[in-house]
């Protein structure tokens, strides 16, 4: 049988022959992860099911990234509980403090996930690792507890939608614009329990960071996973992260897709997702006179070094509007240090940005950038549901780094090509 990317990877991790979408299979997992919000729930379930040890102390990752640095007593208690569990179980990959980053940027950087892996996490944006050619998906904390104990879980093999992007990317149009365009076309439930498989010349041209940006938001269309073929760029990235033994692979010729979509990127312009759903997508040029009080550049979607370079290029020699607070959150300590070496941190500070630690913070309305009634933000994050970043009476627009940075300068949502 000719396999899609999702089927091909799952087949490597099960002893059952995968013959069709919809089939139920048990798969061995390569990595299991949870964070400071979801790990305590998983630990409770782990105890309740009578588990005594994690299946492999080197293949469980616990990353304290959402409410950290601990924003209040409850957050501190959550982290303490998880820390004690990690020590009890001898978990190798426990991250808190100076070595901690946003989980979906940190794990690829450390070489803990890669091509052909099956990764499950108690976080919906676990699908990020599809940018590396992994079948990666979010599960509930109870299922993650089971995976931590057993080293396996069950899946219904998802049908696959193939999205082909052709042409050459124009200036200021990047991976975020591509994925928002796709979500705008099919809706927030357009890929419900489907794998999204990305290909085409424009996809091949993206760097691995851009691919992770797109895979990250597969869930915003309801996707079970977002997948890219593993190619030479993937292998170079993974080798630099310390991985060995990875190999390139792609979907089989003749694989069956439930649906095929095609987008020509050549004439694209920057886009934004308007409140209050990621599929409410419009060209920036059509969003007129929309003022913003906050800009957030960071997150598991767009907090990597390439994103910071893109934002800094727009901000260099310019000042953030006095009516705007622009918050820049490099996604890992490694990215922070690289940005420091390249002078990007200086650029952000000179422009008047607030540069903070690696945290999910404002993305989920947790801390370090909460919106008041009537306030509006543009952010490089992944969700703009009502009340997502604070007050139910606030609004969030989603964009790529260049558009966010340009909007910080003008105080209104701005196409960076017009500066």
From Swiss-Prot:
Alphabetized GO MF terms: 3-isopropylmalate dehydratase activity; 4 iron, 4 sulfur cluster binding; metal ion binding
Pathway: Amino-acid biosynthesis; L-leucine biosynthesis; L-leucine from 3-methyl-2-oxobutanoate: step 2/4
Enzyme Commission number(s) of this protein: 4.2.1.33
Keywords carried by this UniProt record: 4Fe-4S, Amino-acid biosynthesis, Branched-chain amino acid biosynthesis, Iron, Iron-sulfur, Leucine biosynthesis, Lyase, Metal-binding
Disulphide bonds in the chain: none
Keyword Transit peptide: no
Cofactor: [4Fe-4S] cluster
InterPro entries on file: Acnase/IPM_dHydase_lsu_aba_1/3, Acoase/IPM_deHydtase_lsu_aba, Aconitase_4Fe-4S_BS, Aconitase_4Fe-4S_dom, HAcnase/IPMdehydase_lsu_prok, Homoacnase/IPMdehydase_lsu, IPM_dehydratase_rel_enz, IPMI_cat
Cofactor: binding comment: Binds 1 [4Fe-4S] cluster per subunit.
Biological processes annotated in GO: L-leucine biosynthetic process
List of residues binding [4Fe-4S] cluster: 300, 360, 363
Catalytic activity, reaction form: (2R,3S)-3-isopropylmalate = (2S)-2-isopropylmalate
Signal peptide, first to last residue: none
Family the entry assigns: Belongs to the aconitase/IPM isomerase family. LeuC type 2 subfamily.
NCBIfam families referenced in this protein's UniProt entry, alphabetically: hacA_fam (TIGR01343), IPMI_arch (TIGR02086), PRK00402.1 (NF001614)
Subunit structure: Heterodimer of LeuC and LeuD.
Role: Catalyzes the isomerization between 2-isopropylmalate and 3-isopropylmalate, via the formation of 2-isopropylmaleate.
Protein name in the entry: 3-isopropylmalate dehydratase large subunit
